[in-house]
A protein has these predicted regions:
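A short alpha/beta connector and helix-capping loop motif
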Residues: 76-98
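Short histidine/acidic/glycine/proline-rich micro-motifs that form metal-
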Residues: 98-102, 131, 165-168
Length: 259
């Protein structure tokens, strides 16, 4: 008798960082694994169509087949990802740090406005790209509210989701985000997202993500999620210890300036 394949409950929410023919020379070597080639990204969109899924929105997660998200507000979002998405008729959510808008290698406000007119959505990645864990309450609130308000003022629409930089968050960060007016906080926890939850799981897509693994992610098979989930779980405690003693080794920014 044939065995029934295990399918995970929820909605696949994919997390990208950069799409380009090759990563810019200014990208830190530790970030290269997050840069997906344009060819690979096109194939991903083809796979999504062949599986029979449609890209949707975080604010309508229950009816989405898959959600595409991009972190960091890189210039490649406009230069490379947008044309590919538009050609495929696909939607995506872009999480930007408002302090870096207009900086070299990042999106400008005019590009963000153009992308929104093209059907893309923008959410918060904090004001600065800093670790939110351990920030004093006032600084944490500043990071969350400043980004939300700037985006809302510029785009004329509500910003309901925030993604913690580096995927580092705890209950205090989630509570502060909800208090600041967000509906939910997006994580880097490799598992399908559950509609209606206060946290939204996302699975990272890497340069080394194979077509087979990508297909498993779309079909919500454990093989698409468990390897990254295990890596995250095993590194949870060591990563937090390193944050306290030698954060530079992780390539993260922990200091923040107030407005």
């Amino acid at each position: 008798m044939a065995t029934r394949e295990l399918i995970l409950d929820g909605v696949p929410v994919l997390m990208y960082h950069g799409v380009a023919a090759s990563a810019p020379a200014t990208v830190d070597a530790r970030e290269l694994k997050y840069w997906v080639t344009t060819t690979a990204f096109r194939r991903h969109l083809v796979q999504i169509r062949l599986v029979g899924l449609k890209t949707g929105r975080l604010d309508d997660l229950r009816n989405a087949g898959v959600v595409l998200t991009f972190d960091d507000g890189r210039a490649s979002d406009y230069e490379t990802a947008l044309p590919v998405l538009s050609q495929a008729g696909a939607l995506a959510e872009f999480f930007v740090n408002t302090a870096t808008v207009g900086q070299p290698g990042h999106l400008t406000w005019s590009q963000i406005a153009e992308m929104q007119r093209a059907g893309m959505s923008f959410q918060s990645h904090g004001h600065d790209h800093v670790v939110l864990l351990g920030l004093a309450p006032k600084l944490l609130d500043h990071q969350l509210r400043t980004s939300k308000h700037l985006l809302e003022d510029r785009l004329g629409r509500s910003v309901d989701f925030v993604a913690a930089p580096y995927g580092l968050l705890d209950r205090r960060v989630v509570a502060a985000a909800l208090e600041a007016g967000y509906r939910a906080v997006c994580t880097s926890w490799s598992w399908p997202a559950q509609p209606g939850e206060r946290t939204v799981n996302r699975v990272a897509i890497y340069a080394h993500t194979s077509e087979a693994q990508f297909a498993a992610i779309l079909r919500q098979r454990p093989a698409g999620y468990l390897p990254e989930l295990a890596r995250t779980a095993l590194g949870f405690v060591p990563k937090r210890v390193m944050l306290k003693v030698r954060p530079g080794r992780l390539g993260v920014q922990c200091d923040v300036r107030t407005a």
